[in-house]
Amino acid sequence: MWCDTIPFMHDSHVHLTREPLISNLSEIIHSFQDKGGTYILSQSTQSDDFDTNLQLTTLYPAVIQAAIGLHPTIFEDISTKNTYEQKDIFIKGEREIKLFEKYVQKHNNKIKAIGECGLDYYQFSLNESYSKETKEELKEIQKISFRKHLQLALKFNLPLSIHVRDVADSDECVRDVIRLICEEGKGALCGVFHSYTGNMSYLEEILDLGFYIGFNGIITYKSGENVRDILKQTPFDRILFETDGPFLPPQSVRKNGHIKEKFAQPADIKEIIETASQVKNITYEYLEKSSDANYSLLFL
């Protein structure tokens, strides 16, 4: 039984190749271990960081595991100065997708997950210069990319780390993610919806598909009531913890005037679990052990 095992605190979603984490990696890892941490799943977001991310697993083989994937928002970045022609979006986007596919095929035995991947309709909505046509093209290339991630996850029996972010008062993005999962491999795919902040009404459907939910520093924010509500409704056997570092530092870091550079790191998992245990009205020890067991089932 998992309740008899020794806890091994995990960070199921962090970007160790990003600054300032990568430049302070030794200190970051030691701080995590000092707080009882054992496993870190480091996420890729674009082809430029694939090699670096995989190399980290050889530097700290007992601690760091690698997820390889393309973040959906990179398709805005691949065209210079956010100036688009249709051919640029699809030619450059599909080139990046092919690089990802070849990399996973070559290194799948060293990879623990496919990610970070998914759909994001929020980010490009902020750019008022985009035409409706451009926005639809960005949605389409994101879907093409996500399908490829799902297909490779099936082919190599790897879990997914899924990003989904909707425009306010919309559920189009999460509906598309769920639809694509069902079309490509309902019942055969597994993974985690990382940092899910979407509509609560889709939680049951996500869980029914066999996926987990990743919770991070947002649950410590005053503005995180929606995510705390999602946590309350998520069963213990589907909860994972993450930092999404260097993004989303917990409240204690955000409000600390003595900390000049505010970022999230794996050691912050302890504070996140402490907050989650209060939300779930359960002991820290129980929640840590149950979530560690979930990590083990999915990624080890």
Enumerate the language-model features and the residues they cover.
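Mid-domain alpha/beta scaffold segments of enzyme catalytic cores
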Residues: 1-300
